[in-house]
Design a protein with these regions (language model features):
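Bacterial N-terminal signal peptides
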Residues: 10-21
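Basic/polar N-terminal segments that are highly enriched at the extreme N-terminus
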Residues: 1, 22-27
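Bacterial N-terminal signal peptides that target proteins for export
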Residues: 1-12
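Flexible loop/hinge segments at secondary-structure junctions
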Residues: 26-317
Length: 317
């Protein structure tokens, strides 16, 4: 009789486990593959999100490759990847082709020079006027550092831009009312490549996403580079209200509060071909917009507002 009671008890426990335990675990487990390609700007953040998501869902494989926003949108629309990483606004013609953007975070593009630039004192104290930037990258009228920043001598400016179709160049050009193809300079592939080109050239000037101008661990400017402050009010000097470039944290706060202009601040997107149908992709996107947001600031990005996040979540329902 005693053994019979034990057997019945085991059966009941097994039944309850199968009913309430195993099924719940099975429901919570997520499996599948997710592929992303595109913007260098979003690449470090996407890698961090993938790492954290896989800790919770080891059955999910996430493949990520960088190559510029242009590649990301093309790969997404041709179903080469599940999602394209895009660091610019989505064009109307891309929307017509099926592009379905979900904003996931914000960052910005900044001008950079070599830390050994002979005109560095003038650059840092006077800042980059919008007119000066326009005459460096758009018209090409400014050929020397003296013309651009009022320093002495006739030392030439070596101008760099991006060779790949990318959000950083598109947003930097938009700051001057133009498009990427209007930017002048020696073309360099990728964010890391452009940063390296300026680091190697004491007379070089370029632009980078903030994740490549600052060290995400120390929050300081990358060794060998200096971020050029924008003379936002155009008074020929960097005032206290415009001086927020020493650390990544200060710049992020300036972007979040609107002190830093937009553009060159902008939202970053994950884009699918049509509204996402693949379950693992939808779950990853929803996680990014909820629990995944806690990793945004530590990775050197800016969180979206609660209103914006709720709007993006609604797009996935």
């Amino acid at each position: 009789m005693k053994n019979k009671k034990i057997s019945i008890g085991v059966l009941i426990v097994t039944f309850l486990f199968n009913l309430f335990g195993f099924n719940v675990i099975a429901q919570e487990q997520i499996k599948g593959t997710i592929s992303l390609s595109g913007a260098w700007a979003l690449y470090p953040m996407a890698v961090k999100w993938a790492e954290e998501f896989r800790k919770l869902n080891p059955g999910v494989r996430i493949d990520i490759s960088a190559g510029g926003a242009g590649k990301g949108i093309t790969d997404a629309l041709t179903n080469m990847v599940d999602m394209g990483m895009v660091s610019r606004e989505i064009y109307p013609e891309e929307i017509k082709k099926g592009a379905y953007p979900v904003a996931v975070t914000k960052d910005a593009v900044v001008a950079v020079v070599n830390a050994s630039n002979p005109a560095l004192d003038a650059i840092m104290s006077k800042g980059l006027k919008r007119e000066a930037g326009n005459n460096i990258w758009i018209t090409g009228m400014y050929k020397t550092w003296a013309q651009a920043f009022g320093s002495k001598g006739s030392i030439p400016i070596h101008v760099y831009t991006r060779s790949d179709a990318c959000g950083a160049a598109e947003v930097w050009a938009k700051y001057y009312g133009k498009k990427q193809e209007d930017l002048l300079g020696s073309g360099v592939y990728g964010d890391p490549g452009l940063a390296l080109a300026v680091k190697k050239d004491p007379l070089g000037i370029g632009f980078n996403n903030i994740g490549y101008a600052y060290d995400s661990k120390t929050k300081k400017q990358i060794a060998g580079l200096r971020v050029v402050p924008l003379d936002i009010n155009g008074d020929g000097k960097i005032t206290t209200d415009e001086n927020f470039y020493d650390t990544m944290d200060k710049l992020i706060e300036a972007i979040a509060t609107g002190k830093f202009p937009s553009p060159p601040a902008r939202e970053l997107y994950l884009v699918t071909n049509g509204k996402p149908q693949k379950e693992v992709v939808k779950k990853f996107l929803l996680w990014i917009l909820t629990d995944g947001q806690k990793f945004v600031n530590e990775a050197g990005y800016i969180s979206l507002s609660k209103e914006s996040i709720n709007k993006e979540i609604e797009k996935l329902k």
